[in-house]
Amino acid sequence: MTETTNERSATLIDLAEIRGAASLPVVSFDRHELGAILRVYGRMVAAGEWRDYAIDTLRDRAVFSIFRRFSEMPLYRVEKTPKLARKQGAYSVVAAGGLVMKRGQDLAQVLRVFDKSLKLVDD
């Protein structure tokens, strides 16, 4: 008695080989950068001004978006764009309308745009 079997075999494909040079590394925030951003974020959440955030890692930049409510457009975006590091600075804070509020080489300096300024109060 001879049995015939229909075997189907799967072919494994290494996606890294297929993508090859087309898969460029993505830009992301390192641990220290993310820590600095989250310190400012935590302070503003405690003050009741911000409620949510999102992190996007793209090929040319990393974006930390800040929301009052998640269903809205972001109030601010903290962006890291390495290709601008030698020109205008890798870090920037962008307002909802697209206005660049602060740009620079040092993330801590750029994040100071969120510090509340002291105001003189008349008696």
Language-model features: where?
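Mixed-charge, glycine-accented linear interaction segment located at domain edges/termini
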Residues: 92-121
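Short amphipathic beta-strand/extended segments with alternating polar/hydrophobic composition
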Residues: 74-82, 100-107
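Amphipathic alpha-helical interaction surfaces
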Residues: 47, 72-73
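Short aromatic-glycine-(Arg/Gly/Cys) micro-motifs in beta-strand/loop hairpins
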Residues: 13, 78-98
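Basic nucleic-acid-binding interfaces
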Residues: 53-63, 67-72, 85-86, 96-97, ...
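Long, non-catalytic architectural segments outside compact domain cores
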Residues: 2-3, 11, 117
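Negatively charged, low-complexity tracts enriched in Asp/Glu with abundant Ser/Thr
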Residues: 7-63
